[in-house]
UniProtKB/Swiss-Prot annotation:
Gene: trpD
Amino acids binding anthranilate 2: 166
Subunit structure: Homodimer.
Pathway given in the UniProt record: Amino-acid biosynthesis; L-tryptophan biosynthesis; L-tryptophan from chorismate: step 2/5
Name used for this protein in its record: Anthranilate phosphoribosyltransferase
Amino acid sequence: MLKAQISKVVAGQHLSEAEAAEAMDIIMAGEATPAQIAAFLTALRLKGEMVDEITGFARSMRRRAIPLTTSHPVFVDTCGTGGDGRQTFNISTTAAFVVAGAGVAVAKHGNRSVSSRCGSADMLEALGIKVDLPPDAVARCLDEVGMAFLFAPVFHGAMKYAAGPRREIGIRTAFNLLGPLTNPAGAPCQLVGVYDPDLTETVAAVLGRLGSRRAYVVHGSDGLDEVTITGPSKITCLDKGAIRTYTFTPEDVGLPRANLADLAGGTATDNAAIARAVLSGTRGPARDVVLINAAFALLAAGAADTLQQALALAESSIDSGAAAAKLQAMVAWVESWAA
């Protein structure tokens, strides 16, 4: 069923948005074989995914997702693409608790590890949070706690057809890009880390097409799909349809530079320990990189007018104990639901 699309992409031709949506519909309906899915994803990766193609894929997945509604008028997602291969701790997931502690609701979309040792779901489980709650419970958690984890397989059941081929080919594919673009709650504000600097404008353009209000799409010069503190980061801002790109350095907000080794992660247990330490107020590079990523997420949500103000909010979230309290509140809520 996917043969025509494979042939076109292998020939180096781009799919229209409608053609891309049709291809994803075929995959999500279970009408493509694992070999066809793997061939299609690999050919796309070699050609390079275009704005129309990614938009079509995202619209198809959004149509099939279980929607989540919330009472929060403003909320943010910190889901990135993953796939940067740098094996850091879970920076954006830790930052999500800092954002929530600062008073901005977070609908964190995520999954288990695909290419790293520990995905966001893996770390949250190590922190004591059951991740595969049904959608109605996730919605209540978001409304009552101000933070929830939207586990992709629960909301995007049809993704199961691509899971095997993705795992077996072991390379970054269009699906890495689709995580941040298919939040089931339709997060209007986002911080999106991408694994390739050439993707920041592309992903920002797709988010604009999909109706995002404000987003920061970021890539660290060290290869991180995060705002880094080891050197400059490429930042592409989408704000009410307008897109601009600039360079950020840690010195811009008075943060010291660090080495990539200072941000290293490990197993889910290791990463959970790092997250707990950061949220408890331990100072150092891990805290600094979490702070700056939380600051950009707070800026995306409109919680501050400047990055410096947003950074101060993030610092206060940790130092007041609010970020750690948000983690404990989420653990307690999920435990009470499961009891």
